[in-house]
Amino acid sequence: MFPKWFDKWNSDNPTNIFGPAIAVGVAGSAVFVAAMIVAWGQPFATESMQTGPRGTGMHVQEFVADLAEYPDVEGFVTSEPVVPADGAAMAIDELEGVPPALANVSVENYERLVEAMRSWTGIPDLLEPGNDSYQTQVAYSMIEMTQNINQNWAAHVQANAEVGVTCYTCHRGQPVPNNVWFRVGPVNSNAAGWPAIQNRVTMASNFTSLPSTYLEHFLLQDENGNYGVAQVHDLVSRAENPPGSPLIQQTEMTYAWMNYFANSLGVNCVFCHNSRAFYDPTQVTPQWSTASLGIIMVQEQLEQYILPLADVLPAERLGPIYADVPKLACRTCHQGEQQPLNGLNVIANWPELAVLDDVPDYSAFE
């Protein structure tokens, strides 16, 4: 193809063309990447929130891209209430099938709330007069549960600002919320002395070898009416274990519980704990108190409102192993965010859901 003299010259003067080619390629790629970053921004830029004293490495780091407005925020339907006039007719006196928890709501505001609830839950005939489906029966309990949380658990759901909860906080437009959980029981064959609830990757264990039953351990009462307590083994190596002290099994159960918190809120350990003194409860962050109240809040809602629905839900809505009701926990509301819906104030326009067994306060709209 080439003249003989050209081939002879190349053989007499060998040249390594790969080195320069690689150098040119690397330089060109670097220029291209730099131009893209200038034009489109740093795709892996991060922001940090300090959670403890300076110099202790206590911060929660997030990708800026993940801090964009949560997409579910756009799906939240809301409207201002109608301030009822003196002597306004109450829905429970004028309409059929009004939940007792909404006995103090006027006709206009009841119809406004029902329309919003149908959007929040994705159930088009929710609370339809004459409709006695299980969804309507569940709605009766869930309305009361929502009111209970907003009125009695403001220290958790309004710890930093007025936020509150509505049906949409969990449902996000779906009849069954995401991130509910069921009892799972044994997930493995066990060896002597070890429970068969771990060492198998499951969604419940967040794809770790940790126990899969931590939610039922800490959030449901045992046969003696007690809840599991977070425990870790002695900090001293080879320390003698007194009777009643936590074993490594309790430690792993606690780690599974903490891992669930981290995944539910999109945070790390130092969001609640001091990284230099995990063992010292006097050095925790303010978020630790908010989380502790949240645990008790969930325990109460499960016991009072969720578990009694076992006789109401159809078989296809029950758990695959124990036929138990779908249950809520941190991830059901938070869904990976430190505050559900990025801290959107969902209760501002819904005073009907902010009080339990009381008259809604419409003074802010007068």
At which residue positions do the language-model features occur?
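N-terminal export/targeting leaders of redox proteins
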Residues: 1-366
